[in-house]
A protein has these predicted regions:
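Conserved small/polar residues in nucleotide/adenosyl-binding loops
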Residues: 155-162
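Generic recognition of cysteine residues
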Residues: 38, 152-155
Length: 162
């Protein structure tokens, strides 16, 4: 299952980190987030929810999830997922990541600048300032997302639950 990391809610403004958690569910369950590298859906998804090149790492999956949700797509976790994205090696073998200082020195635009632009883009998405085709849809609202997720992205707070 993919969910928000409780220790990283609104870590950088409106951005919250996600985490994948293995579960022992035996049934298909509703989901509130998605992993960009593990999307199984109809082929028209890439036209309905095109990849937004204005994101660099942080924000891309949340943006896609919110755009898909507001365009009427639903997410599900299935038992016995046939693949897994191993982002961090469990044996703790060090490896370079894209924000490695040595590599970052060689870039025309630094990781920190790309990160700022990504997070600003996410804020613009929440404020409905992003134009088609990268905008939020009209089938569901961010308020609808708050109801199912318990996270109010507009006010950067957990939503009170009754």
């Amino acid at each position: 299952m993919i969910t928000y990391r409780q220790d990283s809610l609104f870590l950088k403004g409106s951005f919250s980190r996600q985490i994948g958690i293995p579960t022992k569910h035996h049934d298909i369950t509703h989901a509130i987030l998605m992993a960009a590298g593990c999307i199984f859906t109809k082929g028209s998804f890439v036209k309905d929810i095109p990849y937004d090149p204005n994101y660099y790492f942080y924000g891309e999956e949340l943006s896609m999830a919110l755009r898909a949700f507001t365009h009427g797509y639903s997410f599900f976790h299935i038992p016995d997922v046939p693949l897994f994205h191993l982002y961090t090696d469990t044996s703790d073998i060090p490896r370079k990541l894209h924000w490695d200082p040595e590599d970052d020195e060689k870039r025309a635009v630094r990781w920190t600048e790309l990160d700022k632009k990504s997070l600003n883009r996410l804020d613009d998405l929440f404020a409905d300032k992003v134009e088609e085709p990268m905008n939020l849809g009209f089938d569901r609202s961010l308020e609808d997302y708050t109801l199912i997720s318990g996270i109010c992205l507009l006010y950067t707070s957990p939503s009170p639950r009754d």
